[in-house]
Amino acid sequence: MVDIDYYELLEVDRNASFEEIKKAYRKLALKYHPDRNPDNPEAEEKFKLINEAYQVLSDEEKRALYDQYGKAGLENQGFSGFNQKSFDDIMDFFESVFGETFGGGFGSRRRSDEKYPLDLSIEMEISFQEALFGTQKEVHYSFKVPCSACKGTGAKDGKLTACPECHGRGQIYYRQGFMTFSQTCPRCHGQGEVAQEHCEECSGKGYRIEKEKITIDIPEGIDSGNRIRAQSRGNVSASGMRGDLYITVFVQEDDHFVRYNDDIYMEVPIFFTQAALGETITIPTPRGERELQLNVGTKDKEQFVFKGEGFKNVHTGKKGNLIAQVKIIYPTSLNDEQKELLHKLQESFGVESKPHEEKFSSIFEKVKNWFTK
């Protein structure tokens, strides 16, 4: 079976902006939404594909992978689309993009079974060196587990009654003109049930806080904003399901090296005589000492590239480069002997030492003629 192009699915150009993609998704999702196409399996399948396409094209990293390698590239990174997801998962994604009141007339397909999100997000700071070479880090964090006294209900003895606000539906509905909207019940938070009396053990929250520490692998080449997923390390539901822990990484800046994508930049200060004469110098790089051959007449801000000495790309495995940029240092004060030596050196070059005179001689003549006419 030939893969369907995500851009064709959403009917957008390959250079479409995020807003254009979102607008196209909104239009098509409304058109093929199952509530507007009851008993129409073709529309339901199209709705699934539209959501899959949007989930990829609305994510900068996934879109870049897809543009370069197609669906195979996504699958290699663990993204398998909606094929193995339940329809409720797809509806959850739909509502996460546009909210529960999106579109009007679409009721919630299922009541939330959880009192709190199962997935957890935390942040971690690592050094420049740790990002370059990869490492292992110990993570300490807190997560929620159901209260054993009330079995996660928040009610004394676990006794619940239908929510009087939404009459047990978990949703409340209201009309605006000819449109019907729904939103999560603010009293029971979508549960459809409320406690007759609050559990004394957890004060009605339905959970307690526990602490945990785990060791995670930081891959070589990770960058700020990248997330690491620790499966089944999140909050625990009343039914025993456990969410995932997502760790967002932030890389500290280094005093000597600067990262740009997968390349590393460093500044190499040299004296003006070294630039003029040329010289081989030893420079410290993140991966050890390297020899830098300065050519005769090296220019200020001239760059020298050390291939494969940069960061490893976490997706492709290819390493970036180290770019050493020269900064020429000139003396700010001279003694008499140094001045004399420099004057002699300048004289030894003759007219070569005053390139501005040759450059500007014709301009001087031209300007004179402007005033003699």
Curated annotation (Swiss-Prot):
Record-given protein name: Chaperone protein DnaJ
Cofactor annotation remark: Binds 2 Zn(2+) ions per monomer.
Subunit annotation: Homodimer.
CR-type zinc finger span: 134-211
Cofactor requirements of the protein: Zn(2+)
CXXCXGXG motif repeats: 147-154, 163-170, 185-192, 199-206
Cellular-component GO terms for this entry: cytoplasm
GO terms of biological process kind: chaperone cofactor-dependent protein refolding; DNA replication; protein refolding; response to heat
PROSITE patterns: DNAJ_1, DNAJ_2, ZF_CR
Domain (J) ranges: 5-70
TM region positions: none
Localization per record: Cytoplasm
Residue numbers binding Zn(2+) 2: 163, 166, 185, 188
UniProt entry tagged with the keyword Zinc-finger: yes
Domain remark in the UniProt entry: The J domain is necessary and sufficient to stimulate DnaK ATPase activity. Zinc center 1 plays an important role in the autonomous, DnaK-independent chaperone activity of DnaJ. Zinc center 2 is essential for interaction with DnaK and for DnaJ activity.
Function per UniProt: Participates actively in the response to hyperosmotic and heat shock by preventing the aggregation of stress-denatured proteins and by disaggregating proteins, also in an autonomous, DnaK-independent fashion. Unfolded proteins bind initially to DnaJ; upon interaction with the DnaJ-bound protein, DnaK hydrolyzes its bound ATP, resulting in the formation of a stable complex. GrpE releases ADP from DnaK; ATP binding to DnaK triggers the release of the substrate protein, thus completing the reaction cycle.
Family as reported in the entry's similarity comment: Belongs to the DnaJ family.
Binding positions (Zn(2+) 1): 147, 150, 199, 202
Keyword Zinc found: yes
Gene giving rise to this polypeptide: dnaJ
Key words, A-Z: Chaperone, Cytoplasm, DNA replication, Metal-binding, Repeat, Stress response, Zinc, Zinc-finger
Gene Ontology MF: a single term: unfolded protein binding
Principal location listed in the UniProt entry: cytoplasm
